[in-house]
From Swiss-Prot:
Protein family per UniProt: Belongs to the G-protein coupled receptor 1 family.
Taxonomic lineage of the native organism: Eukaryota, Metazoa, Chordata, Craniata, Vertebrata
Keywords on record: Cell membrane, Disulfide bond, G-protein coupled receptor, Glycoprotein, Membrane, Receptor, Transducer, Transmembrane, Transmembrane helix
Side Extracellular, residues: 1-28, 82-99, 163-187, 259-260
TM segment ranges: 29-49, 61-81, 100-121, 142-162, 188-208, 238-258, 261-281
Major subcellular site: membrane
The keyword Glycoprotein belongs to this UniProt entry's keyword annotation: yes
Function: Receptor for the hormone galanin and GALP. Receptor for the hormone spexin-1. The activity of this receptor is mediated by G proteins that activate the phospholipase C/protein kinase C pathway (via G(q)) and that inhibit adenylyl cyclase (via G(i)).
Naturally occurring in which organism (per UniProt): Homo sapiens
Listed GO MF terms: galanin receptor activity; neuropeptide binding; peptide hormone binding
Protein name: Galanin receptor type 2
Cytoplasmic side, ranges: 50-60, 122-141, 209-237, 282-387
Localisation: Cell membrane
Record's GO cellular component terms: cilium; membrane; plasma membrane
Length: 387
């Protein structure tokens, strides 16, 4: 087997057994192929939904977009190469990719963890201080934060460009750690602290305070409003994504800590644990689109619309478009818009009715004919694509 991945894996082939047929040489690449397929399709759809119609204009959407970019880069640039360490006897991709692949693994891992920490702070400010945080929670500041995220990610992952190198080992060309053990241990500890421990602490603190505020709101009217329900929905979705990140990357970091500070003998059992930690951590890059599809009605509609367009079918029911008279504009995240008072009232109506004037609640309705008279002055027309 090829030598790559976590510290202490230098004798992975010996741990996996001698000659003969290795089941992991078939099973693991198939699982990596599944991760690659689901992750590529899912994250591409997420980016398409957010970019379609200029919807990535809120701070939350920009952070979700950045998370999708990091996951897609990881899937495309890392997973195919890492899958070969269980099938090929040596590293066949050259010295440059030996360094670049591992650098990209840690670059995207840092970017994902920093993005989740940033979006947790964004959700806390949006819910706890909705008015005072408006000047801070702007698309421009979100883009600046994303730039800072990638800058810090480059800073912390840059040393991995020299951490690994291609060399000859037992008549095989392998890609393995080149640093001395003390330097590798210091680097791995720094990676654990800055890419996992600190972001997890930020996530835990912000979401604990956010959930406490949401579920202990003293104003029953505000607590039952559509805006509050929308904020709860988007917070729940981001919380699930953050929890999955913590759980999926935990085995990877636990294994590394065991290598440096515990007992990690090279046996078939520890070899299986190493494979499992790889699969679980890499699978994190393909689960987020599944979470979005399960939690967000907007993403489900967007996925169906894009897939229907690719298949050459007209998406939607009946006319495929609906109209609504709404006062003002909506600038929140995709989840907040879909859970706004407008949509809650339309669902409660149970049937489609003509759009009333501005003095009455607005209900989604089929697009009327030319004889329909528009809303009064001061109202605006909101056109919604229905998948």
């Amino acid at each position: 087997m090829n030598v790559s991945g976590c510290p202490g894996a230098g004798n992975a082939s010996q741990a996996g057994g001698g000659g003969g047929w290795h089941p992991e040489a078939v099973i693991v690449p198939l699982l990596f192929a599944l991760i690659f397929l689901v992750g590529t399709v899912g994250n591409t759809l997420v980016l398409a939904v957010l970019l379609r119609g200029g919807q990535a204009v809120s701070t939350t959407n920009l952070f979700i977009l950045n998370l999708g970019v990091a996951d897609l880069c990881f899937i495309l640039c890392c997973v195919p190469f890492q899958a070969t360490i269980y099938t090929l006897d040596g590293w066949v991709f050259g010295s440059l990719l030996c360094k670049a692949v591992h650098f990209l693994i840690f670059l995207t891992m840092h970017a994902s963890s920093f993005t989740l920490a940033a979006v947790s702070l964004d959700r806390y400010l949006a819910i706890r201080y909705p008015l005072h945080s408006r000047e801070l929670r702007t698309p421009r500041n979100a883009l600046a934060a994303i730039g800072l995220i990638w800058g810090l990610s480059l800073l912390f992952s840059g040393p991995y460009l020299s951490y690994y190198r291609q060399s000859q080992l037992a008549n095989l060309t392998v890609c393995h750690p080149a640093w001395s053990a003390p330097r590798r241990r210091a680097m791995d500890i720094c990676t654990f602290v800055f890419s996992y421990l600190l972001p997890v602490l930020v996530l835990g603190l912000t979401y604990a305070r956010t959930l406490r505020y949401l579920w202990r709101a003293v104003d029953p009217v505000a607590a039952g409003s559509g805006a509050r329900r929308a904020k709860r929905k988007v917070t729940r979705m981001i919380l699930i994504v953050a929890a999955l990140f913590c759980l999926c990357w935990m085995p990877h970091h636990a294994l590394i800590l065991c290598v440096w500070f515990g007992q990690f003998p090279l046996t078939r059992a520890t070899y299986a644990l190493r494979i499992l930690s790889h699969l679980v951590s890499y699978a994190n890059s393909c689960v987020n689109p599944i979470v979005y599809a399960l939690v967000s009605k907007h993403f489900r509609k967007g996925f169906r619309t894009i897939c229907a367009g690719l298949l050459g079918r007209a998406p939607g029911r009946a006319s495929g478009r609906v109209c609504a008279a709404a006062r003002g504009t909506h600038s929140g995240s995709v989840l907040e818009r879909e859970s706004s008072d407008l949509l809650h009232m339309s669902e409660a109506a149970g049937a489609l009715r003509p759009c009333p004037g501005a003095s009455q609640p607005c209900i989604l309705e089929p697009c009327p004919g030319p004889s329909w008279q528009g809303p009064k002055a001061g109202d605006s027309i909101l056109t919604v694509d229905v998948a």
